[in-house]
Amino acid sequence: MPKVAVGGTFQYFHDGHAKLIEKAFEIAEDGKVHIGLTSDEMLSKSHSVDNYEKRRNWLLQYIKEMGIPDDRYEITKLNDPYGPALEEDFDYIIVSPETYPVALKMNRIREEKGKKLLEIVYVEYVMAEDGIPISSTRIAKGEIDRHGRLKKNIKHCNTKN
């Protein structure tokens, strides 16, 4: 049974995150998916990010909605970009264009340590309605919702009576 790793911050759990998680379970078949969730300490985003527990709860909610049994996955806290994937015997790592370079570096380090290389499964970005990738940053800026739908700009006028 394949052992699959996937990781991320998973802020504003959106359709791009869903695609990564779905691909991880598809590749794992009946094996186990190890999900690395970025710790609060590791974050340095240009926008505020919810705490670890809140992001973990969004992730768990989605996995439960998929109907995945508890024994098919494990969520671990990532305190560095690699997490357990440098040491443990994973078969696959699921990546987005953003995390692909990290997976390449991870395989170089694994090779230096004499470990089996991870098979990298590359998942393309999910595009918003405007053809630009869905991202947590765009959601934080109010440009799109979690499904990539454009938000209408509403102008507020102050009127004095």
Swiss-Prot record:
The answer to whether the entry has keyword Repressor is no
**Pfam hit, one:** CTP_transf_like
Kindly tell me the pathway this chain contributes to. Answer: Cofactor biosynthesis; coenzyme A biosynthesis
Instruction: Write the Enzyme Commission number(s) for this entry.
Output: 2.7.7.3
Q: Which UniProt keywords apply?
A: ATP-binding, Coenzyme A biosynthesis, Cytoplasm, Nucleotide-binding, Nucleotidyltransferase, Transferase
Is Cell inner membrane among the key words of this record?
no
Catalytic activity line of the entry: (R)-4'-phosphopantetheine + ATP + H(+) = 3'-dephospho-CoA + diphosphate
User: Which biological process, per GO, is one annotated for this protein?
Assistant: coenzyme A biosynthetic process
What domain of life is recorded for the organism?
A: Archaea
Give the location in the cell: Cytoplasm
Single Gene Ontology MF annotation: pantetheine-phosphate adenylyltransferase activity
InterPro entries in the cross-refs: Cyt_trans-like (IPR004821), PPAT_arch (IPR023540), Rossmann-like_a/b/a_fold (IPR014729)
User: Which CDD domains does the record associate with it?
Assistant: PPAT_CoAS
Q: Which Gene3D superfamilies match?
A: HUPs
Gene Ontology cellular component list: cytoplasm
Tell me where it mainly resides: cytoplasm
Q: Which family does it belong to?
A: Belongs to the eukaryotic CoaD family.
- Which NCBIfam families would you find in this protein's record? cyt_tran_rel (TIGR00125), PRK00777.1 (NF001985)
Q: What role is this protein assigned?
A: Reversibly transfers an adenylyl group from ATP to 4'-phosphopantetheine, yielding dephospho-CoA (dPCoA) and pyrophosphate.
Instruction: Return the protein name.
Output: Phosphopantetheine adenylyltransferase
Can you name the source organism? Methanosarcina barkeri (strain Fusaro / DSM 804)
Upper lineage ranks?
Answer: Archaea, Methanobacteriati, Methanobacteriota, Stenosarchaea group, Methanomicrobia
